[in-house]
Amino acid sequence: MELGYVLTEGKTKIVYAHPTDPDLAILYHKDGITAGDGARRSVIEGKGELAGQTTANVFRLLNRAGIATHFVDAPEPRLTVVRRCRMIPLEVVMRRLPAGSYLRRHPEAAGQRFDPPLVEFFLKDDARHDPQIAPQEIIAQGIATPAEVEQMTDTGRKVFVTLEAAWQQLDVTLVDLKIEFGRTAQGDLLVADVIDNDSWRIWPSGDPAQMLDKQVYRNAQVVDEALLADVRARYALVAELTGRWGAGS
């Protein structure tokens, strides 16, 4: 597929203008994987294709569920065609179980289950390690309106339970999930960016020892070829499993 000019480039993707439609953009999924706000970086050959496949599978499911997203098409495994958005500089995190940074902040929460899923906001700022930000501060800083904060909270929970149900059909527990939102030129709020195997914690049979997500890379003491091959195999399995969500639909 022909690509337009580069709009922006991040750690794991490049965003291109669409060559013919100014309302669209094209995401190119790179082979990079990072952890610690980019402090650890590696390249896994083929990861971009797997990330693109997973993202397409996820967003097709969300679109079928009636959730407003930026996803339009995935003409190639590495490419995602999306509605062009101005991104809101927030990570919206939904949690069913306490893990990761939440458990470090709230060790007393070990063993709890959040119903409905807990929603937290984090300001996208690598230099400050993406600090948590309260809804009232989001509003005070003019990042989003009160209505948008409410919409992101409600939509975040809908996204989570939709993906949670899909994973449950495969005996996989969705522990937590990170998403982002963008605004179209018309002001519509959409689930945007990517949702791939870097975006969640997933535990087959509810067992963290079997985790399939990026946490394997984060947790590793040593990054070597064996680790990267293992991570790639897990990403390939996730791309294949999420592909089953569209079977027969």
UniProtKB/Swiss-Prot annotation:
GO molecular function annotations of the record: ATP binding; phosphoribosylaminoimidazolesuccinocarboxamide synthase activity
Reaction(s) this enzyme catalyzes, per UniProt: 5-amino-1-(5-phospho-D-ribosyl)imidazole-4-carboxylate + L-aspartate + ATP = (2S)-2-[5-amino-1-(5-phospho-beta-D-ribosyl)imidazole-4-carboxamido]succinate + ADP + phosphate + 2 H(+)
Pfam families per the UniProt record, alphabetical: SAICAR_synt
GO biological process, one term: 'de novo' IMP biosynthetic process
Enzyme class: ligase
Metabolic or biological pathway: Purine metabolism; IMP biosynthesis via de novo pathway; 5-amino-1-(5-phospho-D-ribosyl)imidazole-4-carboxamide from 5-amino-1-(5-phospho-D-ribosyl)imidazole-4-carboxylate: step 1/2
Entry-linked InterPro entries: SAICAR_synt/ADE2_N, SAICAR_synthetase, SAICAR_synthetase_CS
Entry keywords, A to Z: ATP-binding, Ligase, Nucleotide-binding, Purine biosynthesis
The enzyme's E.C. designation: 6.3.2.6
CDD domains xref list: SAICAR_synt_Ade5
Family that this chain belongs to: Belongs to the SAICAR synthetase family.
HAMAP family per UniProt: SAICAR_synth
Protein name: Phosphoribosylaminoimidazole-succinocarboxamide synthase
Source organism: Chloroflexus aurantiacus (strain ATCC 29366 / DSM 635 / J-10-fl)
Gene transcribed to yield this protein: purC
